[in-house]
Swiss-Prot record:
Residues 191-212, 239-262 bind DNA. Binds DNA as a dimer. This is HTH-type transcriptional activator RhaS. The keyword Zinc does not apply. Residues 174-272 form the HTH araC/xylS-type domain. Keywords: Activator, Cytoplasm, DNA-binding, Repeat, Rhamnose metabolism, Transcription, Transcription regulation. Signal peptide: none annotated. Activates expression of the rhaBAD and rhaT operons. It comes from Yersinia pseudotuberculosis serotype I (strain IP32953). HAMAP family: HTH_type_RhaS. The keyword Amino-acid biosynthesis does not apply.
Amino acid sequence: MTVLHSIDFFSSSSAPVAIEARAPQSAFPEHHHDFYEIVIVEEGAGVHVFNGNPYTLSRGCVCFVRDHDRHLFESTDDLFLTNVLFRAPDAFRFLSGVGHFLPRECDGVYPSHWRVNGQVLQQIKCLIACLEHAPKSDRVEDIALHESVFMQLLVKLWQGCQTQAGDDQEGRLYQLLDWLQNNYSEAVEWPELADRFALPLRTLHRQLKNKTGMTPQRYLTRLRLLQARHQLCYSDNSVTDIAYLCGFGDSNHFSTLFKREFSQSPRDLRSQL
């Protein structure tokens, strides 16, 4: 597995933060690094496989990667990212309490993926632009100013995550996307789901396609296929059981869709492991 080292990304040993833009981000194999990373999705779509678990990416996704996490990007489609790198939450000279504004693992569950709305993405652009420039010098005041901008960015993201589930259409669409990520195996009737999240059905179709580049049904099918691939790799369940566990009513249809998506059948994938 590829290991990325901080010496290759930070401008100096004293620089607390580095910015790496990916415009666009192409597919990138599984890797980890000796620093922390905040991945901010500005445009496009793709799949982020984080510690073996697949997450679909779209505009407004924010991913928090620790120094012991492994991840990769695949199926990217005009995926524009900004990566904010920092050495560790406790590695700043003048900041404390950074961890309060980062995801916290609880009972073995790490909420690595957040969502923020377009307004927050716009607000943080100027902060990212400031962070792109290394501190003017190694003087304590320049380091302190640089670190203070990073803290502003963290607070903006944290506040944006807390408020993204607001009662406007964009907030309700984000709630729906999160619901699908966690309930992909359930039978979905789109008119009922639209009512549940107080979205007109046509608006749901239009906005979801605008956010993800896919129709709602295509998005759901892809979620299910990604989860099925994960189970094929990391569980002992049979192909038939996995098909049903991931929301497919027929294992033959599942195999057909899987081969169309990944250019190999579920059994072929299993045989390679």
